[in-house]
Amino acid sequence: MTRPIAQKESHLRAVRWWLVFMALLIAAMVLVGGATRLTESGLSIVEWKPVTGSLPPLSQAEWIQAFEGYKAIPQYREMNAGMTLDQFKTIFWWEWSHRLLGRFIGIAFLLPFLWFMWRGALPSDLKRRLWIIFGLGGLQGAVGWWMVASGLTERTEVSQYRLATHLVLALLIFTAIVWTLRRLSDRPPTLASIRLRVTSGVLLVLVFVQLYFGALVAGLRAGRVFNTWPDIDGSFIPSADRLFFEQPWWRNLFDNTLTVQFQHRMMAYALFAVAVLHLIDALVSRANPAIVRGALWLALAMTLQATLGILTLLYEVPIMLALVHQGVAIVVLTLAIVQAERMTEGQSARQRQELGVAAG
């Protein structure tokens, strides 16, 4: 009996390392996507060829053909008229690398997944969860093209709505993987008050809302205007006439650069306040040390992220600083996931042992 259990434990350990690798790949994918956006490279490839598109142009004639395709869209005519072929190659390589990494992630997920199923290393509930994650990954590829297509006919950039959808879906997949990874950890259940559980869940939800707002800021280039802090447009809270001049009023939440940047700022303040209150509650209530450490790291990460956001704004979105800001956002999300999951009932070693037997 000991040998089969040990074998299943070995399988689950391999599954955990595979999921760590996948989470790192998705984080890298988000950063490459951010660089692609910041360098205005996302519309350089005007076709979606999931299989044959994995190869870049291999001859001068193919490069010219790809460049001619780019010349046919509004972005070239209105923003990059006169661009040379060498300049086009620079933006092409960013978008091509982003798509290639997406293809690699699909393969890196599917092949080990099939192998683990063949070896009987996955219990049925874990298989279902991983199939859902794989399906979301396929959907993400389609959403990526849906986003790119929005900038090929009339616009000179992709739709901020579709950009935000693309980013949030990627981070939902990331969240599902990290959560699943945590559920495979060997740890006892962590006791926590209802209030701490609620605030940890609220923090995770607010982080996602803030990530969505951040994507809208990126899509509208709203970080390149109103580059002052703590005031915005001359005051801490702009006038309602400026915030809601578009009709219907709700369109301002997505289309008005002032409103979009303002709500991103306000959400940052709200997140920071909730994180600090969560930490104080954990300390005062003498919560489990793991919960206190998680709350502390989350508050510190949010402090760093807020500082980076302010600097990115004041310096008018330099690429490297903006990418660091995006990278720390992933760290904040990871800490929020871990803290929220920590509040749920963990699996004891005995439960994991039973899970391993069930997988057999």
Curated annotation (Swiss-Prot):
<comment type="subunit">
    <text>Interacts with CtaB.</text>
</comment>
<dbReference type="GO" id="GO:0005886">
    <property type="term" value="C:plasma membrane"/>
</dbReference>
<dbReference type="Pfam" id="PF02628">
    <property type="entry name" value="COX15-CtaA"/>
</dbReference>
<comment type="pathway">
    <text>Porphyrin-containing compound metabolism; heme A biosynthesis; heme A from heme O: step 1/1.</text>
</comment>
<comment type="similarity">
    <text>Belongs to the COX15/CtaA family. Type 2 subfamily.</text>
</comment>
<keyword id="KW-0560">Oxidoreductase</keyword>
<keyword id="KW-1003">Cell membrane</keyword>
<dbReference type="InterPro" id="IPR003780">
    <property type="entry name" value="COX15/CtaA_fam"/>
</dbReference>
<keyword id="KW-0479">Metal-binding</keyword>
<dbReference type="InterPro" id="IPR023754">
    <property type="entry name" value="HemeA_Synthase_type2"/>
</dbReference>
<protein>
    <recommendedName>
        <fullName>Heme A synthase</fullName>
        <ecNumber>1.17.99.9</ecNumber>
    </recommendedName>
</protein>
<feature type="transmembrane region" description="Helical">
    <location>
        <begin position="130"/>
        <end position="150"/>
    </location>
</feature>
<feature type="binding site" description="axial binding residue">
    <location>
        <position position="264"/>
    </location>
    <ligand>
        <name>heme</name>
    </ligand>
</feature>
<comment type="function">
    <text>Catalyzes the conversion of heme O to heme A by two successive hydroxylations of the methyl group at C8. The first hydroxylation forms heme I, the second hydroxylation results in an unstable dihydroxymethyl group, which spontaneously dehydrates, resulting in the formyl group of heme A.</text>
</comment>
<dbReference type="GO" id="GO:0006784">
    <property type="term" value="P:heme A biosynthetic process"/>
</dbReference>
<feature type="transmembrane region" description="Helical">
    <location>
        <begin position="161"/>
        <end position="181"/>
    </location>
</feature>
<feature type="transmembrane region" description="Helical">
    <location>
        <begin position="200"/>
        <end position="220"/>
    </location>
</feature>
<dbReference type="GO" id="GO:0016653">
    <property type="term" value="F:oxidoreductase activity, acting on NAD(P)H, heme protein as acceptor"/>
</dbReference>
<feature type="binding site" description="axial binding residue">
    <location>
        <position position="325"/>
    </location>
    <ligand>
        <name>heme</name>
    </ligand>
</feature>
<keyword id="KW-1133">Transmembrane helix</keyword>
<feature type="transmembrane region" description="Helical">
    <location>
        <begin position="294"/>
        <end position="314"/>
    </location>
</feature>
<keyword id="KW-0408">Iron</keyword>
<feature type="transmembrane region" description="Helical">
    <location>
        <begin position="14"/>
        <end position="34"/>
    </location>
</feature>
<keyword id="KW-0350">Heme biosynthesis</keyword>
<keyword id="KW-0812">Transmembrane</keyword>
<keyword id="KW-0472">Membrane</keyword>
<feature type="transmembrane region" description="Helical">
    <location>
        <begin position="317"/>
        <end position="337"/>
    </location>
</feature>
<dbReference type="GO" id="GO:0046872">
    <property type="term" value="F:metal ion binding"/>
</dbReference>
<feature type="transmembrane region" description="Helical">
    <location>
        <begin position="104"/>
        <end position="124"/>
    </location>
</feature>
<feature type="transmembrane region" description="Helical">
    <location>
        <begin position="265"/>
        <end position="285"/>
    </location>
</feature>
